Amino acid sequence: MTDNTDMEKLDRATTPTPIPNEAPPTSEPSESKPEEAEDESKYPHGLKLAAIILSNMVAMFLVALDRTIIATAIPRITDDFNALGDISWYASAYLITSSATQLLWGRIFTFYPTKTVYLVAIFFFELGSLLCGVAPNSVAFIIGRAIAGAGSAGIYSGSTILITTVTPLSKRAGYVGMMGAVFGIASVIAPLIGGAFTDHVTWRWCFYINLPVGGAAVACLILLFPKFPVNEPVSVKQQIKQLDPWGNLVFLPGVICLILALQWGGEKYAWDSGRIVALLVLACVLLLVFIGIQIWQQENATVPPRLFKIRNVWLGTIFAFCLGSVLIVFLIALPIWFQGIRGTDAITSGIDTLPLVLSLVFGAIVSGGVINGVGWFNPVFFSSVIFMSVGGGLITTFVVDTPTRTWIGYQIILGLGIGQGMQLASLGTQVAVKQSDVPTGVSLMFFAQSLGGSVLVCVAQAVFNNELRSRLTSFDGIDVARIIGTGATQLRHVIPADRLAEVLVEYNAALRSYFYVGLAAACFAVLPSLGIEWKNVKGQEFVH
């Protein structure tokens, strides 16, 4: 898609002056027109590049670890703090600040040096981890989780932004794929590490571990990350204006209300309760006001509206939303199937999902290598949605006695699809926008991916509960409410032994409706993948 001359002039006339950051190249070609081969001599090479990338991977590893390491530590934490009622906040505090600050970090990365902002994000993450480790009570622990969540959002998007700063476009896909692989590996081993610390040392080491490892990464980045030319500084007033304070003033509480409604709805409170309805209404109002402010602010907006005139941006946002939905829905539903239908415990069900996660890692690495080799990322989009749709569809055929080789194979197919697509929306955005817009574009993709998982998993849970209720109401002597409120691992303890087999058949059928929501998201992802603009990243520098 190519903007006309008048629009290009308008963009240049209305673009705010950046404050100290890596100075973007002076040329601004049209969105679709490639230039000559990129000069790779300006980027770090050899051991220096390897050390920077390794430090970046370590930071991403810690963030991924922190997301799930707490799962096996929560029982011991609640024992120490005598705060069983706070369990939901241990996850919610992290998720709320991570989601709410994602776009703000993108804006900060746009106007300040990548190195400085990335180190600040790591600082917040480390500070939150330290507070969690030394927390004397549950309130302090929750505050620490909130601070760490805010820092994790900056690291999550910053890790990709850092790669765009130190690597040429032609080699970027491989490094981005490696980041996806690191995230997958950390997600697999996090519960195991958390369990080991909790059982053999103390749960506090789940958070202390971030300090020395993260500190080493920080030292490496401080010493080795290259210096780039910076633009002339502007006034403090202009800096504040460029960070869109009015937009963030309504966006942050809007996202907080939405996440709380999604976290509490159907669990702590009924969906039609006054609290949930009020939160949803308030979230809608605040987010609509945010959209209005973005249109009003234009270039000073958190997400400049002109970005949505670029096909790869708005289609990439939809694709990222779908991908995040598929990932989270199946990551939650599969352990429920293993625990509820096959009768495994929580740890064993985690091991049983290894085929999905390991194939996801493999898919992320291979897709990066393929894009580096051939230059085109569009075929990988197609491959991703095909594998996701086929794998998701096959998983919906699970029955009570599905053999081991079958559920392993189906997970591998799904994992390959998700892994291939993990970083595609981000990469498609990078080649379609100006270099100065890359931080905003990348943060937007990650926000959409996170939001997709949060929204669709609630939809899937509601569909599952309704389906299960409708299937079990005709069973005499069965307490439907108790079954729905019971965790999957305890399912066999609340069902009479003589009715277990027939109830499991209905439970499996209801759980397939959970899978259908993930399958629907995978199939819908076909549409944006078909519309993504064809661009060859090999040996060319596109838009700056």
UniProtKB/Swiss-Prot annotation:
Intrachain S-S bonds: none
Keyword Repeat: no
Stretch list, region Disordered: 1-42
Gene that this polypeptide is encoded by: aurT
Name of the protein in its database record: Rubrofusarin-specific efflux pump aurT
Consequence of gene disruption: Leads to pink mycelia in young cultures which turn red in older cultures, suggesting a delayed production of aurofusarin.
UniProt pathway annotation: Pigment biosynthesis
Record's keyword annotation contains Membrane: yes
Carbohydrate-modified residues: 300
Upregulation: Expression is regulated by the aurofusarin biosynthesis cluster-specific transcription factor aurR1/GIP2.
